């Protein structure tokens, strides 16, 4: 039997630092093949190593979505690109740098087994840095798959970071550059700037920041509509053995796509949780505090990643249990869908494989993995005619008509991206 969520009192979360820098205003994804240097690049720009999970540290790969904020600055005395930095004091002239903006980085796992995690993270990205290592032939399977995922989800503000230039010859860097140009031809990244860097040695970080500033602008935000937040992580922040009277409520992590959520607001979480009868019920709770960029704030707005502390029983939020839910004011959220019809646009070839394979038409009774917002669900095809497909979902989603869907099919032992859908 679950404890009543309202019995969980609020005790402030420990905050590691307080800062006067602006709150993050844009979410930028780091995507690309496993071991090409995404996490190292986030650390070079933000000072935060996003692999904190014990298994991640042991295996040396990202498993969960990682998050870190970085404040981009500009030296008033340097010429571009040297003027761009994350340092408060210019290392060349010793003068104070001017703040441009703070960005939130979403570090996606590059391993093929973790594609669903990458798709979930892509739902909250405003733009992306595609990291491609110069010491391997381009494209690698997940380089292809991640770029196609960005295209399917509608992310077209892309910068390419050609990483690891410090461990290859100049000739190899130029050869790899041509491989990248050939690879992105005809894709959403065809005109993306390609910046040669070494994340490990922090080489050309200034040129990369300049490219991000010029290529990935902060989108216009809708602050007046009812709020809608996509949950990308959820936590129980209590240490084992915490006495019941000191337990903290569950924490939701994610990003708002519109509106504002304030401390003290009543919120609804859909689809919610499954009861003993197999029915899904929304959760209702109160916002106890909001953390953004390492500090408490009174309200959450679109742009950047936020943590919302609630009165929910922490067993409901532990281990990312509420990922894929959406949060808003009660009665103002999209419908919960147990099935939907979508207009489908299939790729010509399956991406993520070493060998080429054509995408066959979707068939009746076929299981598909569907990414809708931050939700990943399985759907069984109940009708398939031309480009209109109906699916019955194993786990419901909360989504508006017109929402994009990334569609994956089982190929061998893995789910592979095969196309995009629009909910009708």
Curated annotation (Swiss-Prot):
InterPro entries in UniProt:
EFTu-like_2 (IPR004161), eIF2G (IPR050543), eIF2g_C (IPR015256), eIF2g_dom_2 (IPR044127), eIF2g_GTP-bd (IPR044128), P-loop_NTPase (IPR027417), Small_GTP-bd (IPR005225), T_Tr_GTP-bd_dom (IPR000795)
Q: Where is this region: G5?
A: 198-200
Q: Where does Mg(2+) 1 bind?
A: 39, 62
Q: Where is the tr-type G domain?
A: 23-220
Q: Where are the annotated segments for G2?
A: 60-64
Q: Which HAMAP family match?
A: eIF_2_gamma (MF_00119)
Q: Which family does the similarity line name?
A: Belongs to the TRAFAC class translation factor GTPase superfamily. Classic translation factor GTPase family. EIF2G subfamily.
Tell me, how does this one assemble? Heterotrimer composed of an alpha, a beta and a gamma chain.
Q: What is this protein called?
A: Translation initiation factor 2 subunit gamma
Its lineage reads: Archaea, Methanobacteriati, Methanobacteriota, Archaeoglobi, Archaeoglobales
Gene, per the UniProt record: eif2g
């Amino acid at each position: 039997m679950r404890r009543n969520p309202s019995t969980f009192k609020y005790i402030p979360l420990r905050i590691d630092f307080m800062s006067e820098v602006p709150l993050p205003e844009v979410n930028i994804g780091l995507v690309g093949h496993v071991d090409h240097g995404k996490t190292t690049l986030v650390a070079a720009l933000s000072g935060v190593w996003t692999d904190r999970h014990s298994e991640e540290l042991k295996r040396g790969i990202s498993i969960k979505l990682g998050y870190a904020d970085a404040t981009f600055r500009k030296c008033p005395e340097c010429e571009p690109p040297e003027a761009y930095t994350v340092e408060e004091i210019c290392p060349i002239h010793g003068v104070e740098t001017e703040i441009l903006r703070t960005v939130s980085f979403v570090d996606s796992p590059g391993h093929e087994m973790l594609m669903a995690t990458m798709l979930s993270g892509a739902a909250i990205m405003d733009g992306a840095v595609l990291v491609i290592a110069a010491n391997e032939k381009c494209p690698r399977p997940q380089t292809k798959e991640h770029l196609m995922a960005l295209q399917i989800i509608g992310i077209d503000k892309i910068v390419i970071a050609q990483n690891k230039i410090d461990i290859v010859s100049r000739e190899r860097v130029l050869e790899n550059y041509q491989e990248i140009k050939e690879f992105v031809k005809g894709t959403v990244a065809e005109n993306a700037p390609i910046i040669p860097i070494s994340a490990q040695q922090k080489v050309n970080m200034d040129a990369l920041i300049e490219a991000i500033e010029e290529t990935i602008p902060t989108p216009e935000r809708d602050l007046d509509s009812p709020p809608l937040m996509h949950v990308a992580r959820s936590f129980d922040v209590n240490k084992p053995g915490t006495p019941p009277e000191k337990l903290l409520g569950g924490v939701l992590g994610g990003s708002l796509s519109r509106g504002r959520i304030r401390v003290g607001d009543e919120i609804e979480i859909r689809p919610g949780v499954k009861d003993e009868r197999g029915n899904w019920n929304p959760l209702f709770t109160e916002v106890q505090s909001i953390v953004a960029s390492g500090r408490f704030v009174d309200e959450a707005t679109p742009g950047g990643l936020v943590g919302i502390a609630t009165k929910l029983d922490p067993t409901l939020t532990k281990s990312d249990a509420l990922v894929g839910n959406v949060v808003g004011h009660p009665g103002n959220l999209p419908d919960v869908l147990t099935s939907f019809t979508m207009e489908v646009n299939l790729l010509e070839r399956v991406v993520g494989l070493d060998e080429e394979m054509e995408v066959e038409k979707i068939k009746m009774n076929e299981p598909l993995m569907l990414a809708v917002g931050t939700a990943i669900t399985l759907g069984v095809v109940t009708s398939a005619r031309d480009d209109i497909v109906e699916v019955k979902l194993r786990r419901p989603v909360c989504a508006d008509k017109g929402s994009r869907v990334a569609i994956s099919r089982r190929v061998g032992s893995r789910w592979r991206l095969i196309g995009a859908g629009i909910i009708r």
